[in-house]
Design a protein with these regions (language model features):
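A short, Lys/Arg-rich alpha-helix, primarily the initiator
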Residues: 1-28, 71-91
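Intrinsic disorder/low-complexity detector
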Residues: 2-9, 74-80, 86, 134-181, ...
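Helix-turn-helix DNA-binding elements, focusing on the entry/boundary residues of the two helices
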Residues: 29, 61, 84, 95, ...
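Key DNA-contact positions within bacterial/archaeal DNA-binding proteins
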Residues: 30, 41, 73, 96, ...
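Short alpha-helical "recognition helix" segments of helix-turn-helix
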Residues: 31-34, 94-100
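Recognition helix of helix-turn-helix/homeodomain-like DNA-binding domains
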Residues: 37-55, 103-118
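DNA major-groove recognition helix of helix-turn-helix/homeodomain DNA-binding modules
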Residues: 57-74, 121-136
Length: 383
C-alpha cells in the first residue's frame, strides 16, 4: 500500500484523523466495525494508535479507508505530529479542561489534535497543562516521556498501565567509587524499571526529573539505592534535606519550564503566553534560583571521577563534543555487550570555550542537562 510506512509511523495522528472523518460522515464505531468486520477492541487500538504490528495495521487501515471512502492522501494531508489527544485521554482530561487551562479554544484544540500545525506558544501552553515538554507533545522526545506528577495519580495504574507516559516514582541514590557521599535524584517509574533491567551493563543512562541525565560507568559505581517516595528518608545515606546542601525535590516542575529558563536568563523575547510567563516567574521565585544556578541548570555538567575527584563545568552541545553520542548509543542500544563503537575518550567544549578531553575509563558518573542533551540528540539523529 502506498505511504503505508508513513501511516504506520504516524498512527496516533492518523487515528485522530479517522475519528474526525467518522464525525464528519456521522459513522459510529459500531457501524464501522460491522462494515469492516473488525472487532471493537481492534478498532479502539487503531483509533488510539496502539497497534504495534505493522502487518496487522496495514490490513486494518485499508479496511477503514475503504469503508470511509478516503485515500491515504486525505489522512496524511497537512498533518503535524503531536500527542495532545493521546496524552489527554491517558490523563482522562476533557478538551474543555485543556481549553480552560490554556485559553486555547475548544475548536482550535480539536484542530491541533487532528493534526493541524500548532504555534510554539500553543505547544508550550499544552505542555504546561500536561506537566511535560514540547518534545513530548510533538512526539520527538528521545528519553521516555515524563509528566511532573505523582505516578500514582496518573490514571490506569496497575500491572497493565500505559508506559507511554509516567510520573514521579521516588529517588535514586548513587555512591561512586571513592565518592564521599551519595548523590540523590528524582526519577520516574519507568526509570526505576530500566535501572533493574540494565544493572548488569557496563554503562547506564538514567534520565531524572530535575533536568538531569546521568551517565554511569558501572565499574566505578559502588552502590545504587532506589527509594520509593513513600519510604522514610535515609538519614544515614547523606539525604540532602538533612544536610541542607542540595535541592532534589523538583519532580513537580514541568520540563517546559526548563526549556524556557535560558530565555528568561538572557532576557530574550520568546513565543510564550502571559500565563506561562507567570508560571515561569513563579518557578524561579519559589525555588529562589539565582542567575548562576540558572546557568548551571541549563548548561551545567558535573564530572565525578573514579578516584573521587569532582569537577563542575558547562557544556556546549552544538560545539565539538561526543558526549551526546555516547549517551544516545548506550540509552538506545540493544546489544549491551557491544561497546566497540564507543570512543575511549570523551571530549566537549566547556566554559570560556575550553576544550576538554577525558578518558572514559576514569569516569564514574556524569551529570548532564536533560533538555540541552535531548535537543542535541534529536538534531543529530534527525528525530
Amino acid at each position: 500500500m502506498q505511504y503505508s510506512n508513513d501511516l504506520f509511523d504516524l498512527r496516533i495522528e492518523i487515528g485522530n484523523k479517522i475519528k474526525k472523518q467518522m464525525e464528519q460522515k456521522k459513522i459510529s464505531k459500531a457501524k464501522l466495525c460491522r462494515e469492516t468486520g473488525m472487532s471493537r477492541p481492534t478498532l479502539d487500538k487503531m483509533l488510539s494508535g496502539n497497534i504495534t504490528n505493522k502487518t496487522n495495521y496495514d490490513k486494518h487501515i485499508s479496511k477503514i479507508m475503504n469503508c470511509l471512502g478516503i485515500s491515504s492522501d486525505v489522512l496524511l494531508g497537512n498533518i503535524k505530529k503531536n500527542r495532545t489527544r493521546n496524552i489527554r485521554e491517558i490523563l482522562r482530561k476533557s478538551i474543555e479542561d485543556i481549553a480552560n487551562f490554556t485559553g486555547i479554544s475548544v475548536d482550535r484544540l480539536k484542530d491541533i489534535e487532528y493534526g493541524a500545525e500548532a504555534t510554539l506558544t500553543e505547544l508550550r501552553d499544552i505542555a504546561m497543562c500536561f506537566s511535560t515538554s514540547v518534545n513530548v507533545i510533538q512526539g520527538k522526545n528521545f528519553f521516555e516521556p515524563q509528566l511532573a506528577k505523582m505516578d500514582l495519580l496518573i490514571p490506569n495504574i496497575g500491572e497493565d498501565k500505559n508506559d507511554d507516559v509516567n510520573g514521579f516514582w521516588g529517588y535514586i541514590g548513587i555512591l561512586t567509587s571513592h565518592g564521599k557521599k551519595y548523590k540523590w535524584f528524582p526519577i520516574t517509574r519507568i526509570t526505576r524499571k530500566f535501572v533493574y533491567q540494565d544493572m548488569e551493563n557496563k554503562y547506564i543512562v538514567i534520565p531524572c526529573m530535575n533536568n538531569k541525565v546521568l551517565f554511569l560507568s558501572m565499574d566505578n559505581i559502588d552502590r545504587i539505592v532506589l527509594l520509593d517516595e513513600a519510604c522514610d528518608y535515609p538519614v544515614d545515606l547523606d539525604w540532602p534535606m538533612d544536610t541542607g546542601d542540595e535541592k532534589i525535590s523538583e519532580e513537580e516542575v514541568p520540563q517546559v519550564l526548563y526549556e524556557l529558563l535560558e530565555y528568561y536568563y538572557l532576557g530574550e523575547s520568546v513565543e510564550m503566553s502571559d500565563n506561562l510567563h507567570k508560571c515561569l516567574e513563579e518557578f524561579v521565585d519559589e525555588y529562589k534560583i539565582s542567575d548562576d544556578e540558572i546557568e548551571d541548570i541549563i548548561n551545567g555538567i558535573e564530572i565525578h571521577y573514579a578516584d573521587g575527584l569532582d569537577e563542575s563545568d558547562t557544556i556546549e552541545f552544538y560545539e565539538n563534543e561526543n558526549i551526546s553520542d555516547a549517551v544516545s548509543y548506550v540509552y538506545d542500544h540493544d546489544d549491551y555487550d557491544d561497546y566497540d563503537c564507543m570512543d575511549e575518550v570523551l571530549y566537549y567544549t566547556g566554559y570560556n570555550e575550553r576544550e576538554s578531553i577525558i578518558k572514559l575509563k576514569n569516569v564514574a558518573m556524569l551529570e548532564l542537562p536533560f533538555i540541552k542533551l535531548e535537543n542535541a540528540i534529536i538534531e543529530k539523529n534527525d528525530l
